[in-house]
Amino acid sequence: MDLYPLVRPFLPLFTPEQAHGLSIRALKKGLVPADRSPADPVLRTRVWNIDFPNPVGLAAGFDKDAEIIDPLLSLGFGFVEAGSVTPRPQPGNPKPRLFRLDEDEGVINRFGFNSQGLAPFIYQLGKRKAAGLPGIVGANVGKNKETEDASEDYVAGVSATCRLADYIVCNVSSPNTPGLRLLQARTEMSALIGAALSARNDSLPDAATRPPLLVKVAPDLDDAGLEAVAEVTLELGVDGIIMGNTTISRPDSLRSRHKGETGGLSGAPLFTLSTERLGALYRLVRGRIPLVGAGGIASGADAYAKIRAGASLVQLYSALVFHGPALVPRIKADLAARLKADGFRSVADAVGADIR
């Protein structure tokens, strides 16, 4: 039974951050029903030699400290990305720092990488690993605000998580840590990602045991910026790119009273921009690097559009705020129906269909 429609009218009684905390506690206590719908074979897909039960994942940000990975997987996600985690604990930016744009089905945040640090994060991942629990889990790593040499923090994050996560993401695109997005420039990204890859490879000399390393970039990159990202990732042998993070732009269509808040905008207002940038990136990499499409997904049609624009996998987060966890099985069912209706036998067959 989907209880979210009964709960949602009471959400305005809490700040968005309080409501998020309540959702984490509810998931910990098993109060959120699991997805019992049968798996549809058309949604199975293989990326980086990993077999995903479906391509619909949870983006980083919901479970920053890897506390509720298994309850989240039980909602029907094909994979869950925990983080962003910083090497040392930090509180992030002052509150309030999270705003619901109800009229727009969007969210603005300026968290600033609030994190308990790597120690509890890898403890949680280690417990899962030791127990042999199923499910595909990514680790999204970032930098502490006060760190001058960003590479040091990404090396620390990659080194600590590479034996415990199924894939790793270097987040260089949050708009809420000063100077972070400058790391997307060609020279800076080449140095940082090169160091991160070396850290992974040094930690795991056997290439067969290494988790894929991805980079998460901003949808605000212009064509020259995208070209730089594509060139650097191809040159270095990065395994994948997530397009994209939140945007600092503000569409004219926004109606919420919170539309002027500083921070990154996510949710429905981000869909058009992030999907266009995804397609532009796909034209540059042409299947040589798998892409993950994120930004504004709230339906099976949205997920399908991302796949047709070049995404091998997709991620969502903000839509859960407005539609609740029952959205996940609805997206999967609709996506499967759309793939079959268009004659695709698999997700992989549809990747980039609108860009070819």
Swiss-Prot record:
Main location: membrane
Species lineage: Bacteria, Pseudomonadati, Pseudomonadota, Alphaproteobacteria, Hyphomicrobiales
Cofactor(s) needed for function: FMN
Enzyme class (EC, first level): oxidoreductase
Pathway: Pyrimidine metabolism; UMP biosynthesis via de novo pathway; orotate from (S)-dihydroorotate (quinone route): step 1/1
GO molecular function, one term: dihydroorotate dehydrogenase (quinone) activity
InterPro entries named in the record: Aldolase_TIM, DHO_dehydrogenase, Dihydroorotate_DH_2, Dihydroorotate_DH_cat, Dihydroorotate_DH_CS
Co-factor binding details: Binds 1 FMN per subunit.
Family matches, as PANTHER family: DIHYDROOROTATE DEHYDROGENASE (QUINONE), MITOCHONDRIAL (PTHR48109:SF4), DIHYDROOROTATE DEHYDROGENASE (QUINONE), MITOCHONDRIAL-RELATED (PTHR48109)
Binding sites annotated in the UniProt record for substrate: K64, N109, R110, F111, G112, F113, N171, N176, N245, T246
One GO BP annotation of this record: 'de novo' UMP biosynthetic process
Pfam families: DHO_dh (PF01180)
Protein name as it appears in the record: Dihydroorotate dehydrogenase (quinone)
Gene Ontology annotations for the cellular component aspect, listed alphabetically: cytoplasm; plasma membrane
NCBIfam families linked: PRK05286.1-2, PRK05286.2-5, pyrD_sub2
Species assigned in the record: Azorhizobium caulinodans (strain ATCC 43989 / DSM 5975 / JCM 20966 / LMG 6465 / NBRC 14845 / NCIMB 13405 / ORS 571)
Superkingdom of source: Bacteria
